[in-house]
């Protein structure tokens, strides 16, 4: 049951990362310079006080998103993108943190189709709730680790109805981006590096993915030219309980097949 092993492995890795990021947020909350800049409502000072934090946690912990939010859930500062601020944040993790006054975490879909593990924590200074701090990491490295540990390959497919096509096309400079959007009827492939290393022909890759997307199957044997693959899928369910897409896995089992045929 490859899908069950993959699913439980990914969930465990996500939880492990989330726990470590909660510790990071707690350290940031208590930084005196960050607290002072927030209380002064100085965006420039807050950026200057927190950018070294971002550089360190980006390098050491793969954090790609770092936010400070107002109590009304509007964004005050994106440390990773300081030119953009002032927008309403409607994500489930922030709403949940605001409702419960507890740290919230889970995987959510980003604007450009990337899955992001987000951790949002209420921020208290001298016992008073002043805002929310959010950290996020794109989850691609977890799939890399899953593939290596369980000796299979896994790719991420996102439902097209969860994406804005024009925004998605802006995310990549690849010349065949229109082909990539249209290659599958209901999904787009987020990352293809692993499958590229296994199947060099682009048409063959998508044919294998289509077989792996068969909703009736937990896994099946597929043939691509002279290679045999075991393929299957399981749904990507975000923290709000919405199905955002599917993970498709494939294992090249040609050696085993040929050995058994001898």
Which ranges hold each PLM region?
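Amphipathic coiled-coil signal-relay and dimerization helices
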Residues: 36-37, 70, 74-81, 118, ...
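Extracytoplasmic/periplasmic ligand-binding sensor regions of membrane-associated signaling proteins
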Residues: 55-136, 144-146, 213-226
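Conserved beta-strands of PAS-like sensory domains
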Residues: 114-148, 230-259
């Amino acid at each position: 049951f490859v899908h069950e092993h993959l699913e439980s492995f990914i969930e465990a890795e996500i939880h492990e990362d989330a726990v470590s990021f909660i510790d990071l947020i707690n350290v940031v909350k208590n930084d005196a310079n960050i607290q002072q800049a927030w209380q002064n409502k100085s965006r420039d000072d807050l950026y200057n006080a927190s950018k070294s934090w971002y550089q360190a946690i980006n390098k050491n912990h793969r954090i790609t998103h770092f936010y400070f939010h107002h109590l009304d859930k509007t964004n005050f500062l994106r440390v990773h993108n300081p030119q953009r601020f002032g927008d309403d944040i409607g994500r489930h993790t922030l709403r949940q943190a605001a409702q419960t006054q507890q740290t919230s975490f889970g995987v959510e879909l980003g604007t450009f189709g990337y899955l992001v593990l987000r951790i949002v924590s209420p921020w208290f200074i001298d016992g008073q709730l002043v805002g929310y701090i959010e950290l996020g990491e794109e989850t691609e490295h977890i799939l890399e680790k899953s593939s290596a540990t369980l000796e299979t390959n896994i790719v991420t497919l996102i439902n097209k109805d969860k994406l804005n096509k024009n925004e998605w096309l802006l995310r990549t400079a690849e010349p065949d981006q229109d082909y990539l959007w249209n290659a599958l009827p209901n999904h787009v492939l987020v990352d293809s590096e692993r499958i590229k290393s296994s199947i060099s022909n682009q048409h063959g890759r998508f044919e294998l993915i289509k077989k792996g997307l068969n909703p009736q199957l937990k896994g099946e044997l597929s043939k691509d030219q002279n290679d045999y693959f075991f393929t299957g899928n399981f749904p990507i369910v975000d923290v709000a309980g919405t199905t955002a897409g599917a993970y498709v896995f494939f294992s090249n089992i040609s050696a085993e097949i040929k050995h058994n045929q001898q």
